[in-house]
């Protein structure tokens, strides 16, 4: 329950979360449970604005909970929705830009069936997942192809537009496994780097792969 999660020590919650990754989600979930249990007296907020104030909850999650949980008229914009709207309206604004996100959120809100928001949100997400797919979309049988800007222009594959590519960075660590009488030395990471507040074997971060290979 939310109450049990709220009073549980964070270290215990980490242990139960072990292996799932994304530990920031674990921390946010714990903090949100405490807010609901203690500050809100166990009552889950029932407005978009209040839900958005919960730690770890962004516009997408807040809209989804508002629509599916409370029947409120908020458009849910996920990858499927971005794809459907960008192709149908021929919008070449990058979906990963701040202005692009605002444009698509407003467009989705304008298209929303106010009195049937949950059904509409589910329908457009399902449509993007099964018909207006990223690869090999079913344009030939799509019921909206006569009005789809990208289909009529033969540019379906060009949408949605993205401006950023995630740049991966390699890091090299040398870990020390120190054992004495069946017990191992570990340390707790601090700061805001990777694995924050998690336990690890003592280690050094090396500057280059060559240095790591010859350590």
Descriptions of predicted regions:
Residues 1-140, 144-153, 157:
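Catalytic cores of DNA base-excision repair glycosylases
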Residues 126-215:
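Intrinsically disordered, low-complexity, charged terminal extensions of DNA damage-control enzymes
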